[in-house]
């Protein structure tokens, strides 16, 4: 059994991770955290999430969770700032880490990479297997279609999402620029007013926010007389949690290093 701690265990992603882990047969949840001052601190995690008792008491810090139980891996879907702090704790304790948070600054990404020198870390803006297949296919389409097609990325999420564009949209933009031999300067994140004709090298990344949209990403390849649309729509959070649990199985017991879902899924690197 892989002994697992879930940060933010009573939140939307945390409770989904707990539910799927309980049904997994090979993952044992031994700890969980909630923010300091949360009403769930001190409660049984299963009771707090209406799953029934699971004999895991919610605590208010990762340090306390790791003090209370030996763990093989921590799964973290909190925030970029907290994930960096949690990575430092895992590095000090020798515990593997799976990070699904988004909104990382370059400095935060560098701090995460520093912690990965001590422990294995899987970090990805989207843990869904389907999304990661879309990312891979988008890069391949861009390489095959080449400069004859204009490329745009559109993402939509619920009104409560704090960062924009989404981490997945930024990852799509990253692989598209690599595949097309372009740079960050070719990305545009907003258009307004008399902007003139579209530059040939431009890649647009646009954002929608509203309602309860779990997550939707579309890459448009716009050519003369034809258009290709590559879309992933999430209707619940189960696929994100399932991907994170898959990553937890993969990373537990590995040597230190920073990995992403392409490594977990065994994708051959193309760039």
Curated annotation (Swiss-Prot):
Active-site residue list: 157, 161
Biological or metabolic pathway of the protein: Amino-acid biosynthesis; L-lysine biosynthesis via DAP pathway; (S)-tetrahydrodipicolinate from L-aspartate: step 4/4
Compartments where located: Cytoplasm
Pfam families in alphabetical order: DapB_C (PF05173), DapB_N (PF01113)
Positions with a binding annotation for NAD(+): 8-13, 100-102, 124-127
GO MF annotations, alphabetized: 4-hydroxy-tetrahydrodipicolinate reductase; NAD binding; NADP binding; oxidoreductase activity, acting on CH or CH2 groups, NAD or NADP as acceptor
CDD domains documented for this protein: DHDPR_N
Binding positions for (S)-2,3,4,5-tetrahydrodipicolinate per the UniProt entry: 158, 167-168
EC number annotated for this UniProt entry: 1.17.1.8
Superkingdom of this protein's organism: Bacteria
Family that this chain belongs to: Belongs to the DapB family.
Protein name according to UniProt: 4-hydroxy-tetrahydrodipicolinate reductase
Gene (name only): dapB
């Amino acid at each position: 059994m892989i002994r697992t701690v879930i940060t933010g265990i009573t939140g939307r992603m945390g409770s989904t991770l707990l539910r799927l882990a309980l049904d997994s047969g090979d993952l044992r949840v031994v700890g969980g955290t909630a923010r300091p001052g949360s009403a769930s601190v001190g409660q049984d995690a299963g009771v707090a999430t209406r799953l029934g008792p699971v004999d895991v008491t919610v605590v208010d810090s990762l340090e306390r969770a790791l003090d209370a139980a030996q763990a093989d891996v921590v799964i973290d879907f909190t925030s970029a700032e907290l994930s960096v702090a949690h990575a430092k704790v895992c590095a000090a304790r020798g515990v593997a880490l799976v990070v699904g948070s988004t909104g990382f600054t370059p400095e935060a990404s560098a701090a995460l990479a520093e912690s990965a020198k001590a422990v294995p870390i899987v970090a990805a803006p989207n843990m869904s297997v389907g999304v990661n297949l879309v990312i891979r296919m988008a890069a391949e389409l861009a390489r095959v279609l080449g400069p004859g097609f204009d490329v745009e990325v559109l993402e939509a999420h619920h009104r409560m999402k704090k960062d924009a564009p989404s981490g997945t949209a930024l990852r799509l933009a990253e692989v598209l620029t690599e595949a097309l031999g372009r740079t960050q300067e070719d990305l545009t994140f907003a258009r307004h007013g008399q902007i003139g004709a579209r530059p040939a090298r431009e890649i647009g990344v646009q954002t929608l926010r509203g309602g309860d949209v779990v997550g939707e990403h579309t890459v448009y390849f716009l050519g003369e007389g034809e258009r290709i649309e590559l879309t992933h729509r999430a209707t619940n959070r189960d696929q994100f949690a399932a991907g994170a649990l898959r990553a937890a199985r993969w990373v537990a017991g590995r040597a230190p290093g920073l990995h992403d879902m392409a490594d977990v899924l065994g994708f051959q690197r193309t760039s």
